[in-house]
Amino acid sequence: VSTFNVTGYSLGGFNAAYVAKLDETRQSFNFENVLLINPPVSIYNSISLLDRMINNIPGGMDNFDTFFNNLMRAYTNVYKESADAIGDDFLYKAYKALNLKDEQLAALIGVSFRLSSASLIFTSDVVVDFGFIKPKGLILNRYSNLTQYNEVANRIGFTDYYHEFFYPFYKETEPDATRNEFIAAISLKEIEDYLRSTEKITVMHNADDIILQPGEIEFFADVFGTRATIYPTGGHCGNMSYRDNVAHMVEVFTGGGTP
């Protein structure tokens, strides 16, 4: 192996930027090219957007179980009537068959994020024994009933986790850091000077990405300049497999940078 490149999408794109900066100091890989695909500007801002999408559930969070069960029942019916294996074609067919309104789609995205974040939050709580969901000091084993913890976790927003678990936990080792300083530290703006100055990092994004707050897409055009390729549509990573987009990604790594 003579050269190393790195890429990542979504949170992985965010991480790739920080890994590249860290490698400037450690010189472990000396990355030749780095491609960020649909990264957030601010992790906190993006998770706040995803958190709020769950508010689109008809009847609110009190109707979470009913909404989720009805959705899975409809999804199962489409699956039974389809000869397609679960994949892009099937998911598109399910989307068309369910005929979801924009609010329902937003709620679905919110539920998907909530289920993923619930697992992360509960696992983190168990590993460090913080006492956020599981009582502090309680030891779980393979036979422990986790139903009650799952019900609690599904009703905890990621921003709640940040303010009530993440920040207090790290506050013990960084006592002088404020909440806003912690939020600022998990943002690409924290390494903006580096991103402006290095020629090895390029970004591929979509103007309508749902994880970006209004105005955040301009950050990429401003900071990366000609190293930014911003498509008008595509949502969050929705056009990664398009032929032109794939060709762009390949060109970044084989053509020495921005096509």
Label each region the model flagged.
Residues 6-8, 37:
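Short beta-strand immediately N-terminal to the catalytic nucleophile in serine-hydrolase-like folds
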Residues 1:
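Alpha/beta-hydrolase active-site loop
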Residues 21-145:
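Alpha/beta-hydrolase-fold enzymes
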Residues 8-16:
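Gly/Ala-rich beta-loop-alpha elbow adjacent to hydrolase catalytic centers
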Residues 210-216:
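Conserved alpha/beta-hydrolase "acid-adjacent" motif
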Residues 197, 202-205:
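Short beta-strand/loop motif that positions the catalytic acidic residue
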Residues 172-193:
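Active-site nucleophile elbow and catalytic-triad environment of alpha/beta-hydrolase enzymes
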Residues 231-245:
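Catalytic histidine-centered segment of alpha/beta-hydrolase-like enzymes
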